[in-house]
Amino acid sequence: MKYIIVILIIIMNLTILSAEEYRIVDSRTGKTLSLQQMANELKKYDLIFFGEDHDNATLHKLERELVPLLDTKRELILSLEMFERDVQSDLDAYIENWLTEDEFLAKSRPWSNYQDDYRPLIEYAKQKKITVIAANIPRSIAGKMARTGPDFTETLLEEDKKWLPDNISYPDDSYKKAFLETLEDMHSPMMNNNPDWLYQAQCLKDETMAESIVNA
């Protein structure tokens, strides 16, 4: 049996106290847990979602400390939103020492905070030969959808269509409402685009990452 950690919502509440400390609370019981206690609880699950503020150093520190505690008897797979499907072969090659780090970074389009926040996870995976999933849709494809709407596939190159998920749905529900409200609160320049297209592009990302995890 394997289990997958997805670096994205965690089932516990994390109260950030400062840049150096945090408190972990089981939202079901209100009980404060140690990191080891949380890891022991999480080991019961096949799929663990870790939601993060991508720029929060404390949460990244927590990720780095948590992953080794989960890497025990069961096969562990790590899935990252940052890496996109078209760089999976490059990610695999780096984990297997077929690419240098410079070659890998040149090919894989990592986020600007990769070195400080994500590199330790990838290096741990490389050391332990843990599978890492490049789960997301290539950003160029999601961007095209955000700019032109759901008919964007008509202008996609055939070589790009292979990165699409088999199914894409756009639920008209509370998720959509919350997504659009968040964009409005952020006063994001993206709102200059059609808000529905932005939502659909997010759904495309969600569907792609979900399918990547299921197929792992």
For the regions a language model picked out, list residue spans one by one.
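Sec-dependent N-terminal signal peptides
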Residues: 3-13
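Stable alpha-helical elements in mature extracytoplasmic
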Residues: 34, 38, 58-66, 114-121, ...
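Short internal beta-strands
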Residues: 77-84
